[in-house]
Amino acid sequence: MTSTNEPIPTEEEIKNGFKFIQDEICKFLITTTGGHQQYSEDKWDYTKGSGGGISRVWEGKEEEGFYLNQDYQSQNNKCDKIEKGGVNFSYIVGSNLPSAAATQFKIAPDTKYIATGVSLVIHPYNPNVPTIHMNVRYFEAGDVWWFGGGVDLTPVYPKLDQVVEFHSTLKKVCDQYGQEENKTSYALGKAECDSYFFLPHRGETRGVGGLFFDHLKSDKAKTWKFIYQLGLSFIDLYKPFLVNNSSISYDKVQREYQLYRRSRYVEFNLLFDRGTKFGILSEGRTESILMSLPAVCKWKYNYKPEENTPEANLLTFLRPRDWLNENQENKN
């Protein structure tokens, strides 16, 4: 099915669109963090074909004591806000898909394929600022093509009104650019996200969800427009957290709980994430694949937070909920 109202995007337009998304997000992160915390840029080549990528990585100071200092809040504007983060753009061309992928998608051996997109993860220092993940991508092999992408939020000390605002922003993007027939509605994307970012061995979701779409292959022009706008929406989605929550003071208990909760993030990425599995199986670039992991995390044996604590409150958020219809009188 193709659109009769809009021109079908070319491979070059899609590639350049993703590159623009990377640039805009990086500008936002630099500006919002005060301009002093710069990323390191790594331009790399795809050695098993052609193309490559640009990885932009933030790695904060390793001065744990400083970030727990009582003067942290007064010095906040001079402090690094991103402990570990990265915004990656890639565009690769190859002809040797993993056999499992080639079989699943009925792609003949040695078929040329292209894969391009932007992937990002931000792990902040402050436990009051949630981790965020976003991915927007395009794949093509012969006559087969599809778009995919999504965004999800992983707070440690969530505030209900902020979670509702996050989902409201996502719904606005879907209402304006998504379509039910293209499977890009908010309801479908949210349900898929709740299902995908679930840790079965823990019985909980990774965070408070968001949107997740994969194998979108109906109406290329409209689907590309949706994916493009979803990528740019990152700024509106994350700005309230990065601007408003970074100045909230925190103590060692909160920092320790943040590190403990990060272990769940690592478990999901290494055990269940499709992108990680595909990257490893296809002998992709290891540094880019594992960029999403936090700099520091902890595991504690059989740990359970005490009842009626802010730490225990998080667990009430780690299940699928109809965020847009939450009772605002019960704000946390």
Curated annotation (Swiss-Prot):
Homodimer. The keyword Aminoacyl-tRNA synthetase does not apply. Belongs to the aerobic coproporphyrinogen-III oxidase family. Its EC number is 1.3.3.3. Involved in the heme biosynthesis. Catalyzes the aerobic oxidative decarboxylation of propionate groups of rings A and B of coproporphyrinogen-III to yield the vinyl groups in protoporphyrinogen-IX. One of its GO terms (biological process) is protoporphyrinogen IX biosynthetic process. It catalyses: coproporphyrinogen III + O2 + 2 H(+) = protoporphyrinogen IX + 2 CO2 + 2 H2O. This is Oxygen-dependent coproporphyrinogen-III oxidase. Coproporphyrinogen III binds at residues 119, 135-137, 284-285. The active site is at residue 133. The lineage of its organism: Eukaryota, Amoebozoa, Evosea, Eumycetozoa, Dictyostelia. Pathway: Porphyrin-containing compound metabolism; protoporphyrin-IX biosynthesis; protoporphyrinogen-IX from coproporphyrinogen-III (O2 route): step 1/1. InterPro entries: Coprogen_oxidase_aer, Coprogen_oxidase_aer_sf.
